[in-house]
């Protein structure tokens, strides 16, 4: 694209663009941000802007597109939400007084991980930016939410854990050290880049005093380095005060119940796996928080349940108190509805972007605190203690109240922000303006009297200032020596007099000084807020916690949840357990509850029964009860006695990863291997229909081997559902395995009815054909399948028909399980067939991706033809 090197402005633009080649450069030009060249072409498409050109008639016109500066934030958000970066270039001096080219510089680089939110939107999502640092045999992760100030770090020995942590946090952008990009880019980019996560690089540098202060509590060297990289990136890109970022804290992942992204997805924890929305997920059910801070904290608790029983019990005590005291809970929640996003308001104050309306939002939030405190202090000891921790910050609320008007404008540069009586100078300027307005009104009366023109009026125009307007029919009645023509209209003339000019100067001067003074005082108040950021953040943490706990109590009350108890024994004792999300979408009383009892002698339940009968629901409900209990929530059951679990592993549903070239069976085996390698006796393992992705006897053999490995080596509490009824005999030889099944009955007409109840012993048959009939398969097909099934059960033959022949394979009643049944006649009849068979022999089927398989099939088809 052509460049106009001899234009000073374009030279300046290219110098800036060279520093930010991967970002859209928003170049401030008067009242607009301009995009040039490729930025303009691409930006016009994404943002639906009009594409024009600079120097249209030249040999190389420069594409450009403009955005009004007051509307820029909306366009920036669109680009950043799609994974782009935006460099904001501002004029660093007043163009009216600048000598030569106006100085410009990048004041902020907005990226997916540094995007800010306001304090009023009620956004319950964190926006995390992370840094990942490979060290000797470990990986360290540091992450920050710039919009709240949260800064944390952790270390793990496995790259898979890094990916799980980033996935759990829903990180939008990952920063790598420039020194590590070459060595780690392939490993990270292949798994992050394809998932829409932006990868950025940051050079290493000696930590500043601020960075050293923020990392002083960290003890692990690699965590300090990762956090330093992260903070240096933020300071380089944001170029503003970041006093709201709290000192980094380190946490051990072992202190939390661990589960990976597949488990989060399989259990619909934070979003429904099918719709990808919050509705239909566990979070959607239990989130009754009234503040944005509470909503974010609830999600954090859900994704990081605890393993320390004393911490869990402390949460449960508060939930219990709120559940027992409906009036206190209701009053608290009413007050919480008046609280804005304190964390993000504090962040905006620190960064200097807080406007007057947000100051009022802060004041209104603080005004709700005394009411919250009063309600809690009148409750039981547990809640009263929580209330005593609240700082109502009446000093700050009073300052904002006395200084800032209740309904300020959005702009902080146009005045009308400061209350009357707060500042003598502003009051003086306002009096001057008021006096002059009265003078203008009197001028109009006097001019009408002197001229006899009753239609004469005094007005104001932004371009021409104050004027006297007279219709053309009355022009002759004016004394020409006093009136100076200012503007000619179609039906009127506008004039100015020396006296009017003099008063206009007084008005303009008073307005400018008033506006300047109001902004000065507004900044003073905002700086006062900034000095109290740590108090606001501490208050926000307390409010968020109260919001979450009262929300959980509300759910417990409305959903009939009970308080779980924890035991040091290796037992699960759940009476009338329920799947909370499934129950919530059914009519009252329709959900069939089930007991889950695994005492110290039983580690595994082998679950059989027909498809659609509820095996997966039974398994999921146990996992959800465990997660709810360890996050500090009541649970959907009549009784729930549980051990403290360290990890949950699930394989539920067929989650093929076609994009990663992995088949159902490969995913099954990878997830099973993760459990077999990582699970302990304190883990919970849920395997649903493992082995279905391969040949029947291969799958059965693997399923049996996995069951026996779990039983012999791991001893984890396990629910293992299977359609291989032959495996039920394992319970005869393994005393820690018990058979259960999901009940179903046939009526007199042969129709199948699911009971959805877990019953002792193995299922007598799978009812697969009944399920196929329920799915609506043709009756002819169902009848044929029934006939074939009877033949198989009698040890007869399977018959497959083609256009040319009928080939039979006889199943002997005493055939060993390991013998595969040949369904097709594979006799070689010619060279072409032999070539095809040779090609098949050479294919590495187990390591083929779906795309490889399709290409291979196409080659075989060509060989045949």
Curated annotation (Swiss-Prot):
CDD domains: ABC_MutS1
Protein residues bound to ATP: 609-616
Disulfide links within the chain: none
Keyword Transport: no
Domain of life of the organism encoding this protein: Bacteria
Pfam families attached to this UniProt entry: MutS_I, MutS_II, MutS_III, MutS_IV, MutS_V
Statement: the UniProt record of this protein carries the keyword Nucleotide-binding: yes
Functional summary from the UniProt entry: This protein is involved in the repair of mismatches in DNA. It is possible that it carries out the mismatch recognition step. This protein has a weak ATPase activity.
Matching PANTHER family: DNA MISMATCH REPAIR PROTEIN MSH1, MITOCHONDRIAL, DNA MISMATCH REPAIR PROTEIN MUTS FAMILY MEMBER
GO CC, any one term: cytosol
Example of a GO MF term: mismatched DNA binding
Keywords: ATP-binding, DNA damage, DNA repair, DNA-binding, Nucleotide-binding
Assigned protein family: Belongs to the DNA mismatch repair MutS family.
NCBIfam families registered for this protein in UniProt: mutS1, PRK05399.1
Protein name, entry field: DNA mismatch repair protein MutS
GO biological process assignments: mismatch repair
């Amino acid at each position: 694209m052509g460049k106009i090197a001899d234009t000073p402005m374009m030279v300046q633009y290219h110098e800036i663009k060279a520093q930010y080649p991967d970002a859209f450069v928003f170049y401030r030009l008067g009242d607009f941000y301009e995009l040039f060249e490729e930025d303009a072409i691409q930006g016009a498409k994404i943002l639906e802007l009009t594409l024009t050109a600079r120097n249209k008639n030249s040999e190389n016109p420069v594409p450009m597109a403009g955005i009004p500066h007051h509307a820029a934030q909306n366009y920036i958000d669109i680009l950043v939400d799609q994974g782009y970066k935006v460099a904001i270039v501002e004029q660093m001096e007043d163009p009216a007084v600048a000598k030569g080219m106006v100085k410009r510089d990048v004041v902020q680089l907005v990226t997916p991980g540094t995007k800010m939110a306001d304090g009023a939107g009620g956004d319950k999502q964190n926006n995390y930016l992370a840094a990942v640092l490979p060290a000797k045999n470990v990986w360290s992760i540091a992450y920050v939410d710039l919009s709240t100030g949260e800064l944390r770090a952790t270390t793990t020995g496995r790259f898979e854990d890094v990916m799980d942590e980033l996935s759990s946090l829903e990180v939008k952008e990952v920063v790598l050290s420039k020194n590590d990009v070459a060595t780690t880019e392939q490993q990270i980019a292949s798994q992050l880049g394809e998932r829409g996560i932006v990868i950025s690089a940051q050079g290493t540098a000696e930590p500043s005093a601020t960075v050293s202060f923020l990392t002083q509590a960290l003890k692990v060297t690699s965590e300090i380095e990762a956090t330093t990289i992260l903070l240096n990136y933020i300071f380089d890109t944001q170029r503003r005060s970041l006093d709201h970022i709290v000192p980094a804290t380190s946490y051990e992942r072992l202190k939390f119940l661990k589960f990976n992204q597949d488990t989060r997805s399989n259990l619909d924890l934070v979003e429904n796996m099918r719709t990808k929305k919050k509705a239909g997920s566990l979070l959607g059910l239990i989130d009754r928080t009234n503040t944005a801070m509470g909503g974010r904290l609830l999600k954090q608790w859900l994704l990081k349940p605890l393993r320390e029983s004393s911490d869990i019990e402390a949460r449960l005590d508060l939930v219990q108190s709120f559940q027992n005291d409906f009036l206190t809970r209701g009053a608290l929640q009413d007050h919480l509805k008046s609280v804005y996003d304190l964390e993000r308001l504090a962040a905006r104050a620190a960064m200097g972007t807080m406007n007057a309306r947000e100051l009022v939002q802060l004041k209104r939030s603080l005004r709700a605190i005394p009411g919250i405190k009063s309600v809690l202090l009148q409750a039981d000891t547990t809640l009263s203690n929580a209330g005593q921790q609240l700082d109502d910050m009446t000093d700050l609320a009073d300052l904002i109240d006395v200084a800032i008007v209740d309904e300020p404008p959005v702009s902080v540069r146009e005045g009308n922000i400061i209350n009357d009586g707060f500042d003598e100078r502003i009051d003086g300027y306002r009096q001057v303006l008021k006096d002059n307005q009265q003078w203008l009104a009197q001028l109009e009366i006097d001019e009408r009297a002197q001229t006899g023109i009753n239609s004469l009026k005094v007005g104001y125009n932004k371009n021409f200032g104050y004027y006297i307007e007279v219709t053309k029919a009355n022009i002759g009645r004016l004394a020409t020596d006093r009136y100076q023509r200012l503007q000619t209209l179609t039906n009127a003339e506008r004039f100015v007099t020396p006296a009017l000019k003099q008063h206009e100067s007084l008005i303009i001067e008073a307005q400018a000084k008033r506006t300047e003074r109001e902004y000065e005082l507004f900044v003073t108040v905002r700086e006062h807020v900034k000095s109290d950021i740590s108090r606001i953040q501490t208050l926000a943490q307390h409010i968020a916690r109260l919001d979450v706990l009262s929300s959980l109590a509300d759910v417990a009350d409305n959903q009939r949840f009970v308080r779980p108890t924890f035991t040091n024994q290796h037992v699960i004792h759940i009476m009338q357990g329920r799947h909370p999300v499934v129950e919530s979408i059914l009519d009252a009383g329709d959900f069939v509850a089930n007991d889950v009892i695994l005492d110290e002698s039983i580690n595994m339940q082998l679950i059989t029964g027909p498809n659609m009968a509820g095996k997966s629901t039974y398994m999921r409900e146990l996992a959800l009860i465990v997660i709810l209990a360890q996050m500090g929530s009541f649970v959907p059951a009549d009784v729930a006695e549980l051990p403290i679990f360290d990890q949950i592993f699930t394989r539920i549903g067929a989650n093929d990863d076609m994009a990663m070239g992995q088949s159902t069976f490969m995913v099954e085996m990878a997830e099973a291997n993760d459990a077999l390698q990582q699970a302990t006796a304190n883990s919970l393992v849920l395997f649903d229909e493992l082995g279905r992705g391969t040949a029947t006897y291969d799958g059965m053999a693997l399923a049996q081997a996995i069951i026996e490995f779990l039983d012999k080596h791991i001893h984890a509490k396990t629910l293992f559902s299977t359609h291989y009824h032959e495996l039920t005999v394992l319970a005869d030889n393994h005393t820690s395995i018990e058979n259960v099944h999901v009940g179903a009955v046939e009526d007199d007409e042969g129709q199948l009815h699911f009971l959805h109840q877990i019953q002792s012993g193995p299922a007598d048959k799978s009812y697969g054909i009944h399920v196929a009939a329920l799915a609506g398969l043709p009756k002819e097909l169902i009848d044929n399948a029934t006939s074939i099934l009877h033949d198989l059960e009698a040890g007869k033959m399977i018959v497959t028909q083609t256009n040319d022949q009928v080939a039979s394979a006889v199943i002997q009643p005493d055939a060993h399980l390991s013998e595969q049944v040949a369904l097709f006649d594979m006799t070689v009849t010619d060279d072409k067939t032999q070539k095809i068979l040779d090609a098949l022999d050479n294919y590495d089927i187990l390591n083929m991706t779906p795309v490889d398989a399709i290409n291979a099939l196409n080659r075989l088809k060509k060989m045949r033809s």
